[in-house]
Design a protein with these regions (language model features):
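Basic/polar N-terminal segments that are highly enriched at the extreme N-terminus
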Residues: 1-2, 71
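Amphipathic alpha-helical hairpins
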Residues: 2-5, 9, 43, 53-55
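Short, well-ordered alpha-helical segments
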Residues: 4-37
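Residues in well-ordered beta-strands of folded domains
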Residues: 12, 43, 64
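Short amphipathic alpha-helical leader/targeting segments
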Residues: 36-40, 66
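Short, conserved loop-to-beta-strand elements that form functional interface hotspots
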Residues: 40-49
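C-terminal structural segments of small proteins and small subunits
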Residues: 52-71
């Protein structure tokens, strides 16, 4: 097995539908600009409230991807 280094960054996904949809939005959006995305770990879940009702579900994710020198 070759040596590898991974970078971890935090993203927040938002959806009016569900936490799952919020996580999917975050991963799919990050994957458009981050190559070799490997793992997404949900670290926090919360909601925004408007007029006494849930307006949006939010998921904070730590995403990891293979580090390439020069990036």
């Amino acid at each position: 097995m070759s040596d590898s280094v991974y970078r971890v960054t935090e993203v927040i996904g938002v959806s009016p539908e569900s936490w799952e949809a919020a996580a999917r939005n975050a991963v799919e959006t990050a994957a458009r600009t981050v190559r070799d995305l490997r793992v997404a770990e949900a670290t926090r879940f919360d909601v925004t409230v408007q007029d006494g009702k849930i307006a949006n579900y939010r998921v904070r994710l730590d995403i990891s991807f293979k580090y390439e020198p020069g990036n």
